[in-house]
């Protein structure tokens, strides 16, 4: 089964939905301790607390290496700052999905418009292109 990491997980809705809909294990990383508490409560109420975990911490310092899918809903500047960490920690072939915001020069594999929102999908490459290695 997939292990979804949601970076900047907020109230946990993405992780909880993945667990409820697909039976995926999920880990949310969120810096705001109040949102982490809320996410844990939401997971209990949704009946998926055994599948999900919410960690309070800085997403730039988190170990995300076990992720088989990563989701983001972060500003473009944050996405771009995070990009080298994604390349360093994730295995080639791992999908990265961002809601509304792109990754600058890293062109997505796929872009989908959903009810006025844009969803971007990338795949961690075998080799990092030279223009993206910073």
Where are these regions (language model features)?
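Conserved class I S-adenosyl-L-methionine
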Residues: 2-10
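S-adenosyl-L-methionine
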Residues: 37-66
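Conserved SAM-binding motif I beta-strand of class I
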Residues: 25-30
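A short SAM/SAH-binding and catalytic strip from SAM-dependent methyltransferases
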Residues: 65-81
């Amino acid at each position: 089964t997939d292990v979804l990491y949601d970076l900047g997980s907020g109230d946990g809705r993405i992780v909880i939905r993945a667990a409820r809909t697909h039976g995926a294990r999920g880990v949310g990383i969120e810096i705001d301790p109040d949102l982490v508490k809320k996410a844990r409560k939401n997971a209990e109420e949704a009946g998926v607390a055994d599948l999900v975990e919410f960690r309070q911490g800085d997403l730039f310092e988190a170990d995300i290496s076990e992720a088989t899918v990563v989701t983001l809903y972060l500003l473009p500047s944050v996405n771009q700052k995070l990009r080298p960490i994604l390349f360093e920690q994730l295995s080639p072939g791992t999908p990265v999905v961002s809601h509304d915001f792109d990754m600058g020069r890293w062109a997505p594999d796929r872009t989908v418009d959903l009810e006025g929102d844009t969803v971007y999908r990338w795949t961690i490459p075998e080799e990092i292109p030279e223009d993206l290695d910073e």
